[in-house]
Design a protein with these regions (language model features):
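Hydrophobic residues in beta-strands and at strand termini
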Residues: 15-17, 65, 111
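Hydrophobic beta-strand-centered segment that forms part of the acyl-chain substrate-binding groove
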Residues: 43-76
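Compact, glycine-rich, soluble single-domain proteins
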Residues: 26-44, 58
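HotDog/MaoC-like acyl-thioester-processing domains
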Residues: 69-71, 76, 80-114
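Catalytic strand-loop segment that frames the active site of acyl-thioester-processing enzymes
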Residues: 1-29
């Protein structure tokens, strides 16, 4: 599920990462997939806010891994648009499991009008 939380003005996506996305004997979600969940939330919010008229291209992304992300646990990505102009947007994102913050990220996106 993905939705706009209007009260917090943030984009929320629910994921269920499977054991197929792990390393370390199936116990930890690989960092690239963690990054992808955060990136998806940040990018989708730009698309949602533009009513599908903007395609965000991630120019730069910075992810901080705070705790290990486990498989088969509902995982929530939340994002905010910090600033958006005509051609560039800056976003922040967070990833949670069981209400525990497991990773944070920020990105710079080039906006292509479609």
């Amino acid at each position: 599920d993905a939705y706009h939380d209007k009260d917090k003005d943030e984009w929320v996506i629910e994921f269920m990462p499977s054991k197929d996305l792990t390393h370390s004997n199936g116990t930890i979600i690989q960092g690239g997939f963690v990054s992808g969940m955060i990136d998806a939330s940040m990018s989708q919010f730009i698309m949602y806010e533009s009513k599908g008229k903007a395609l965000p291209l991630t120019l730069d992304i910075d992810i901080k891994f705070l705790k290990s992300c486990k498989p088969n646990i509902k995982t929530i990505a939340k994002s905010k648009i910090i600033r958006k102009g005509k051609s560039i947007a800056f976003t922040n994102g967070e990833l949670y499991q069981d209400n525990i913050l497991v990773a944070v990220g920020s990105a710079t996106n080039k906006i292509i009008q479609i």
